[in-house]
Amino acid sequence: MTATQTSASVVHDLGALAHRLSHSARTRCVCEPPQVLADRPDGTVVRSGAIVAKAHAADTDREALAARIALAAAPQLTGILLPPLTAPEHPEPSDASPRPGLPEPPTPTPRPVTLWPFGAPVDPTDPEAAPWAEAAVLLARLHRTRPPFRLPPMRGPAKAARAVARMRAARPGDPAVLPVLACWRALPAWARGEGPPPAPRAGYLCHGDLHLGQLVRHPAPDGPWLLIDVDDAGAGDPAWDLARPAAWYAAGLLDPEDWSAFLDAYRSAGGPAVPADGNPWPELDVPARALTVQTAALALAKCAAEKRDPDEPEQLMIESCARIATLPPELTTDHAS
C-alpha cells in the first residue's frame, strides 16, 4: 500500500488484513468475500467475518487519531463507544503456510489502519425503527462523561469549513453557492472552525459527526446500540452533536415525532447540551445552521462532480440556507453556542 495506491488496492489490502485476523490459519476457511462498507477519500472500511478494518485518510493527524482510539478503548466509555480491537501479536504461527487463494497480508501503509469488531448497523429500509431515542441517550451519556485525558478539539466545525471549501472549488463563480456562503459568513468564527467555542461550552466530550450511520448493535445482531467512528471526537460544544437532527427537523427532513423522541430522550438522560425543559433553540441555533451549511455545501459539490441537479433532500437543505440567510442568528452572549 502506497500513498498513491488506488482505491481497489486499498480495499484489497484491508480485506486481506481483516480476513487474516478473523480466524487462525489452521481453521478451515468458509468466509464470504470481504465486504466494502465504505470507500471515500476520508476513509475506506472493509469487513471480513467479525473483523472490520479501516484505512483513515493519508493526511490524518496520527497523534490526534491515537488519542481518539484510546478514548474509544477507555473503560469510562464502555457501553457508549464501540471499542477498537487490538490485533493479536502473532495472529498466525510464523511457520504457517499461506492459505490457498488468499491474498498476502498488506505491507505497512502511509494511511493509518485501525481494527474494529463488526456491529450490525441501522436498517435504512425501516425508518420507523430508527433508534433516535437510543442515539440521544448515548449522546447524553457521552456528554456527561468527563474526558479521561487531554483530547484534541472536536472536528465538527473543521469539517463544515472543509465542506464549504470543497463547494467553492467545485463551483467557482456559480450563483447557486451564494445563499450557502451568506449563511456561512453569518456564523460566529468558532462555528466556522476559526477558533474555540465559548469557554462555558468548550470542554465537553463530543462525538463530532452524529447521524444514524454512526450506530451499531454489538454484539451483532441484537446487542446494545453503541456509537462508532471516533475520527471527529474530542472536546467541544455538545450542541454540535444534536445539530444534524435539529437541522433536518428544521428543513422538514426529520419527522416531528422523531425529533421529539430524540430531544426528549436526551433531556431525560441528563444531556447538558440544552436546558432540561423549555426552548432548546438558543443552544442549538448556531450548530444547526452550521450543519445546514455543511450539508448544502456537500450537496452542491457532489452535484457538480456528478453533473446532476440536487435531489429533493439536497434541495431542501440548499433552500434552508437561503431562508436562514435572511434571518438574524441568535448570537447573544447568553446563547453563544
What is the meaning of each model-derived region?
Residues 1-32:
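Juxta-kinase regulatory segment immediately upstream of eukaryotic protein kinase catalytic domains
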Residues 274-288:
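All-alpha amphipathic helical-bundle segments outside canonical DNA-binding/catalytic cores
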Residues 2-5, 166-171, 175-176, 295-337:
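ATP/Mg2+ or Mg2+-diphosphate-binding catalytic cores
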Residues 35-54, 85, 189-242, 252:
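Active-site acidic catalytic loop and adjacent metal/ATP-binding pocket
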Residues 123-181, 200-203, 316:
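A cross-family kinase active-site recognition segment
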Residues 52-109, 120, 125-142:
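A conserved alpha-helical element in kinase catalytic cores
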Residues 109-126, 144, 162-172, 290-311:
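A glycine-centered beta->alpha junction motif in the catalytic cores
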Residues 239-272, 289-307:
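Active-site activation/catalytic loop segments of kinase-like enzymes and analogous catalytic loops
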